[in-house]
From Swiss-Prot:
The gene is rnp1. This is Ribonuclease P protein component 1. Keywords: Cytoplasm, Endonuclease, Hydrolase, Nuclease, tRNA processing. Coiled coil: none annotated. GO terms for molecular function: ribonuclease P activity; RNA binding. Disulfide bonds: none annotated. It catalyses: Endonucleolytic cleavage of RNA, removing 5'-extranucleotides from tRNA precursor. Its EC number is 3.1.26.5. GO terms for cellular component: cytoplasm; ribonuclease P complex.
Length: 94
């Protein structure tokens, strides 16, 4: 399955450039970097000078694809990465 804006929530996120554009914690808004690790509840972003752990469920992320920037509500990403990427059909994360 190709990486498109429609399929991004079901793809591997590690390696993508990402920015936190909204969050319940105002201190994490504006954090940007490359996704270096993903767990069920967290995205780990490596910036220029540090590594940030951002909760998925309370943030909105902007992922940079080669053609455009895609906004994804973190609630759509809350799942074990392996399970989130293998679901097909009428998926909650689609």
């Amino acid at each position: 399955m190709p990486l498109t804006p429609e399929t991004l929530p079901r793809h591997e996120l590690v390696g993508l450039d990402c920015e936190v554009v909204a969050a319940s914690n105002p201190d994490v808004i504006g954090i940007s970097g490359t996704v270096v690790m993903e767990t069920t509840q967290m995205l780990t972003l490596e910036g220029a000078d540090r590594v940030w752990h951002v909760p998925k469920d309370s943030a909105t992320f902007a992922f940079d694809l080669s053609t455009e920037t895609v906004l994804v509500d973190g609630d759509r990403l809350v799942a074990r990465p392996a399970r989130r990427t293998e679901n097909t059909g009428d998926s909650l994360w689609r």
